[in-house]
Regions:
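N-terminal accessory/capping or targeting/presequence segment of soluble
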Residues: 1-102, 167
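Flexible, acidic/His-enriched mid-domain "rim/lid" segments that flank
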Residues: 1-3, 9-15, 95-209
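Long, charged, glycine-rich C-terminal linkers/tails
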Residues: 210-214
């Protein structure tokens, strides 16, 4: 599939796009929710850290004039995220609101507009209430749509990877189609057919467990 890990240039492009949108909306900082799951692990955290969450909840603090910081409900995974190099200030703890609060310069942000990303379905209700209570900032706005619109506009690297992924899917289906008579003649089971297809995907770097549901 010719997959290439995105470098720091890709990170900078994404960060610049987000900060441009923040500036247009007079938002000083974003607090972004992340939830590790098969479906949502590809979301906000992956976009900002290039690290796929399989479990754990987290928050990213993304100011317009400083490097972002991150808290996660696993210190070990937080350390792995920092080693990836996109967000370096990472720490773990079960009380996300408290952990993030300890990283902030409250005096600096007291009179600033803060945007929350993921308040509807990503950030747990208790964590969200804890944040509102601790921050005590009047000018908090919902910034989920803002972030989603930025994320929807794909970079050159993202477009290439999407194209590569679809080409891999196409090639895999053609391989199955070309061998379907042989599968029938050899009385191969559905499990054996899926295994043959998965071998192709694994050899090309596909590691998503959803493959096994095919």
């Amino acid at each position: 599939m010719n997959y290439k890990i995105p470098d720091i240039k890709e990170r900078n492009i994404r960060f610049s796009k987000i900060k441009e949108a923040m500036q247009k909306n007079d938002i000083y900082a974003l607090i972004i929710g992340g939830k590790g799951h098969w479906w949502t692990g590809r979301g906000y955290f992956r976009y900002l850290t290039d690290f796929h969450l399989w479990g754990h909840d987290g928050l990213i603090y993304f100011p317009i004039d400083e490097e972002p910081s991150l808290v996660l409900t696993s210190n070990a995974v937080a350390n792995k995220i920092s080693k990836r190099g996109w967000v370096n200030n990472c720490s773990g703890g079960l009380e996300l609101g408290k952990e993030l609060y300890n990283k902030l310069d409250i005096k600096k942000i007291r009179n600033k507009k803060i945007g929350i990303v993921g308040s509807e379905s990503i950030i747990p209700h208790g964590v969200l209430n804890d944040l509102y209570e601790k921050l005590d900032i009047k000018n908090i706005v919902n910034a989920t749509d803002l972030f989603d619109k930025v994320k929807m506009a794909k970079t050159e690297w993202e477009i290439k990877q999407i194209k590569n992924l679809w080409m891999l899917a196409q090639d895999t289906m053609v391989l199955f189609q070309d061998n379907i008579v042989g599968y029938s003649n050899n009385n191969k089971s559905q499990l054996e057919i899926c295994s043959d297809i998965n071998k192709v995907l694994w050899e090309n770097g596909v590691r998503d467990l959803l493959v096994f549901y095919g």
